[in-house]
Design a protein with these regions (language model features):
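Catalytic helix-loop patch of NAD(P)-dependent Rossmann-fold dehydrogenases
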Residues: 77, 81-82, 105-147, 152-153
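N-terminal Rossmann NAD(P)H-binding glycine-rich loop of SDR-like oxidoreductase domains
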Residues: 3-21
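Mid/C-terminal beta-alpha module of Rossmann-like enzyme folds, strongest
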Residues: 196, 203-246, 276, 283-289
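SDR active-site strand-loop-helix element
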Residues: 8, 31, 59-60, 97-103, ...
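Rossmann-fold cofactor-recognition segment
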Residues: 30-42
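NAD(P)-dependent short-chain dehydrogenase/reductase
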Residues: 135-185, 191-192, 198
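C-terminal amphipathic/interface module of NAD(P)-dependent oxidoreductases
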Residues: 235, 252-289
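NAD(P)H-binding glycine-rich loop region in Rossmannoid oxidoreductase-like domains
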Residues: 42-78, 91
């Protein structure tokens, strides 16, 4: 009998990728914001109790530096207290907890790739609240996988994240995109993350913290340049400084990550090719995953 996975945030970018990779081997119970409010912990408790999952995968978070600066209480509850509550339920209900963190828990000081051994030092409220959630999970439950991931590209149903926003602008006829060339991360394909999560689980890796990212580092400009070229889009992509755009919180300008625990994933440029091939095939929504 297949194990039961409760996937919280099942229609987001990471949720779609996980459903695609895990669907044949697990019974997946997908829940999104239409089904429950992650700020209402009693609703969360009820959904988990009714689902009786063997594994809970949480992709729900309050994303973004500026949104967190605007709504600090919401950021704290969703990114810190909500994962803490999931960790407590993991202990009491006996399920394996899988949670996703971010490269934004690091500062810009290292000048090299951050690994699992590096000590986080958040620069902004987003990173601070996410790191708080990480700490609670590590302190409260023993049966967990905590995956730190960088900026993601991948199939999506909403145009509410960086790559989708840029592609929407192109779709609307914009011919020139000015994009930050001085924010460096490790662009990563959501499906590659999902495959690696599967591999780690299937091989019964030791519980704990893992960094998952495509190999290499790049700016947001580099990423969109690569995507638009692979899709043969009629648009000019220009590099700019992040300081040319409005912002509230302190930016993470150099946070590429890699793992010292697992083998490197394919290079981010190869991952972009795979992503763009899927876009050209019309693979966008969960109906076609």
């Amino acid at each position: 009998m297949s194990k039961r996975i409760l996937l919280l945030g099942s229609t987001g970018k990471m949720g779609l990728a996980l459903r695609h990779i895990f669907r044949d081997a697990y019974l997946i119970i997908g829940k999104n914001s239409h089904d429950f409010d992650a700020l209402n912990f009693e609703q969360v408790r009820t959904i988990i109790g009714e689902s009786s999952p063997d594994i809970v995968i949480n992709t729900v978070a309050f994303l973004g530096i500026d949104p967190c600066e605007k709504e600090p209480e919401r950021a704290f509850r969703l990114n810190t207290l909500y994962p803490k509550f999931l960790a407590e339920l993991s202990n009491s209900n006996g399920f394996l907890l899988i949670h996703f963190s971010t490269d934004a828990v690091f500062s810009d000081e290292k000048g090299d790739f951050y690994t699992e051994k590096d000590c986080p030092r958040p620069l902004n409220l987003y990173g601070f609240t996410k790191y708080g959630g990480d700490c609670f999970i590590q302190a409260i439950t023993k049966r967990y996988y905590l995956f730190r991931i960088p900026v993601l590209f991948g199939e999506a149903t909403k145009n509410n994240q960086f790559v989708e926003k840029m592609l929407q602008k192109i779709h609307e006829g914009q011919k020139v995109l000015k994009i930050s060339g001085n924010i460096i991360s490790s662009p990563t394909y959501s499906r590659d993350v999902a495959r690696e999560v599967w591999r780690i689980m299937d091989a019964s890796y030791q519980f704990g913290l893992y960094h998952i990212a495509n190999e290499g580092k790049a700016s947001l400009y580099d990423l969109m340049k690569e995507i638009t070229e692979n899709l043969n889009l009629d648009v000019e992509v220009e590099a700019a400084s992040y300081k040319e755009f409005p912002f509230l919180g302190i930016k993470n300008t150099f946070t590429p990550i890699k793992s010292e625990k697992i083998s490197p994933l394919r290079h981010w440029k190869e991952a972009v090719k795979g992503y763009c091939n899927n876009i050209e095939k019309g693979v966008h929504s969960s109906d076609r995953l």
